[in-house]
Amino acid sequence: MDIKLLYRLAKYLRFYKKDLIIVMISLLSVSASLLLIGSVFRNLIDKGLAEDNILSVNKSILYICLLIVILSVASFFRSYFINNVAEKIVNQIRKEAYSNLINYEIEEYEELKIGDIISRLTNDIDQIATLIVNFLSFFIRNSVMLIGGITLMFFESFKLASIVIVTIPILLVPLIKFGKHVKSLSKKALESKSLLVSDIDETFNNIRVIYAFNHQINKISDFDTKLQSYLIYCKIRLKIRALFFAISIAVIFLTITLIVWIGASDIVQGDLSAGQIISFIYYAIIAGVSSGGIFELLSEIHLPTTALERIITIIDKISIVHNNYYALNNPDTVSIEFKNVDFTYNSRPNLKIINNMSLKINANKFVGIVGRSGAGKSTLIQLLLRFYRQDNGTILINNQDISRINPTDIRKFIAYVPQEASIFSDTIKSNIIFGNNKASDYEINEIIKITGIEEFSNKLHDGINTKIGEKGVRLSGGQKQRIAIARALLRKPKILLLDEAMSALDTMSEQKLLNAIKKIMKGNIIISIAHRISSIESADYILVIDKGKVVTAGSHYDLSKNSEIYRNICREQLTI
């Protein structure tokens, strides 16, 4: 096992010193009770049964009962406190991992699968609990029992104890031989399990599409393929574990048989008493079971340590942070400017999405953005939100370079509504106040009326306090978009970004809602990406983007007269 990993785990353990002291006292009490029983057995046979001394027999039985009580009580405290510590630590680790993950740069999520994240935060962290319990409880207990058992065996018979010691290297050879192989298999098994979780997450997030295309059988087949891959690694690992366990059992019991054989000869010759040989066999069994337990734990330790390693990579991953951020000015008016901005995604380094883009948007403007798919419209918004950093050029808000401003401060000024409305599995109200949890009931009710949520929420049993299911499954696409827009408006942003945010609404509803938005956002900036030209006809001006550049700009009327590319976009919509 990697010592660095143990040291890392020990940093968490230091917060639970009192609990761990109780665990250690309990462990020693359990070990001492079991070891003392062997000594009592010897007295029972040699002084009680051999001498027909019923008083000695009764005393020995009483001592055994007392030791069993101590053993039981100590076992309870050991089990309770170590498992309690393990749960507290894994929850602390889970919180740290979650907190770090949720603060990653957006582009870092492109390298991760949601299923892998879920697997690490659940399965991997549960494995860490197993590591804590096994190491701090069973490993230490078995180590104490092994050392104590061997020591007491030497007190009983040096010759027989020497035979037992010889068997230890025999057990170490296969452990070392199989150890590296098991570690590799454990890593592959965890990765394979992550793929399973990803598949489950993807399947049930897209269950309607699967039903619509009758792909249930195909998905079952795909899942079975991944399941079989996971099972292959598990089977190999279990075979190695079973083989090692079989070797351990064989060596342990052959050793005990040899001890009985030689011990019987010593009894006949008068070198050992019957009580001594029984006591020795008892200690040999204790030592054998303890060593078997240790080897069993060591053969299985690679799975939880690999899981710990995977979690530590999440906790230790540091996103790029600049300490020399400036505060974002908060004047009465707001402005946006792009100066010669270039951008490419890390996943597509050879494809320039934004190409030397320049534009300026002043306060009190409603700006529409159009362009063909892949032109860079949504990327423009994501750069403004600081989801990504531009490769070249400068992006300014209020004449300040946003690369020098904390992204959190930037986003306080902005509200963003994507085409696919992000809805949480909570109530309508909770989803709305996600934009501003300090809003008054009056403000919430006004936004609900303005966005038309009242029209459908009043028909629900609990109104805006109705639970709407995972991802708003109980709502229509248009209803979800209204909630997302209400959330954005409640934020009282200086800049409102709409990325096809009303695509699920009919034209009349869209115009009504848009007029309401324009009133609320008066004096500020609205940027609306649209595939439906009708939604931006009333814009102050429209930016036409092609191949990552603003190729032309103007009102709908001017562009319809003077821009061929704009007319083509309009014609393409009419043919859809």
From Swiss-Prot:
The keyword Lyase does not apply. Its main location: membrane. GO terms for cellular component: plasma membrane. Residues 20-303 form the ABC transmembrane type-1 domain. Gene3D superfamilies: ABC transporter type 1, transmembrane domain, P-loop containing nucleotide triphosphate hydrolases. It is found in: Cell inner membrane. GO terms for molecular function: ABC-type oligopeptide transporter activity; ATP binding; ATP hydrolysis activity. Keywords: ATP-binding, Cell inner membrane, Cell membrane, Membrane, Nucleotide-binding, Translocase, Transmembrane, Transmembrane helix, Transport. ATP binds at G371, R372, S373, G374, A375, G376, K377, S378. InterPro entries: AAA+_ATPase, ABC1_TM_dom, ABC1_TM_sf, ABC_transporter-like_ATP-bd, ABC_transporter-like_CS, P-loop_NTPase, Type_1_exporter. Part of an ABC transporter complex. Transmembrane domains (TMD) form a pore in the inner membrane and the ATP-binding domain (NBD) is responsible for energy generation. This is Putative export ATP-binding/permease protein RT0691.
